[in-house]
Amino acid sequence: MKQRTLSIIKPDALKKKVVGKIIDRFESNGLEVIAMKRLHLSVKDAENFYAIHRERPFFKDLIEFMVSGPVVVMVLEGKDAVAKNRDLMGATDPKLAQKGTIRADFAESIDANAVHGSDSLENAHNEIAFFFATREF
């Protein structure tokens, strides 16, 4: 089934200048980038986007990291886009990620793990709406 999902290329990946390589992974695996923008999240935006993690011990560090530099947010579209994107990203901890996944190849740590991807269709819908107006894709 054709789906849409959100992907965020995080500040660590932008600093390493691997944005193009990450986008190529998506495109060469059947995911089309239908909307994309580069931006610098404010603390408020990062806190609102990651509100589900507010009570978790890593929340403060996550927010500090996500506002430490620019990010690239994208809407990806394709067959089973949510699952395909998650497979391409690999495990949250790059040490546990399978060889050839984005996180295994480009991430430094569980905190600086290169990419974010929606974990369900419902969350994809909400996350896309957080960053993009319908007219943008």
UniProtKB/Swiss-Prot annotation:
Domain of life, source organism: Bacteria
Catalytic activity: a 2'-deoxyribonucleoside 5'-diphosphate + ATP = a 2'-deoxyribonucleoside 5'-triphosphate + ADP; a ribonucleoside 5'-diphosphate + ATP = a ribonucleoside 5'-triphosphate + ADP
Listed GO CC annotations: cytoplasm
Cofactor list: Mg(2+)
Cited SMART domains: NDK
InterPro entries: NDK-like_dom, NDK-like_dom_sf, Nucleoside_diP_kinase, Nucleoside_diP_kinase_AS
Keywords carried by this UniProt record: ATP-binding, Cytoplasm, Kinase, Magnesium, Metal-binding, Nucleotide metabolism, Nucleotide-binding, Phosphoprotein, Transferase
Subcellular location(s) of the protein: Cytoplasm
Signal peptide interval: none
Single GO molecular function: nucleoside diphosphate kinase activity
Keyword Phosphoprotein carried by entry: yes
Enzyme Commission number(s): 2.7.4.6
Gene Ontology biological-process entries: CTP biosynthetic process; GTP biosynthetic process; UTP biosynthetic process
Binding site for ATP: K10, F58, R86, T92, R103, N113
Keyword RNA-binding annotated: no
Disulfide cross-links: none
UniProt main location, coarse: cytoplasm
Residues the record marks as active site: H116
Known partners and oligomeric status: Homotetramer.
Family label: Belongs to the NDK family.
NCBIfam families: PRK00668.1
Functional description taken from the UniProt entry: Major role in the synthesis of nucleoside triphosphates other than ATP. The ATP gamma phosphate is transferred to the NDP beta phosphate via a ping-pong mechanism, using a phosphorylated active-site intermediate.
Stated name of the protein: Nucleoside diphosphate kinase
Lineage of the species this protein comes from: Bacteria, Pseudomonadati, Campylobacterota, Epsilonproteobacteria, Campylobacterales
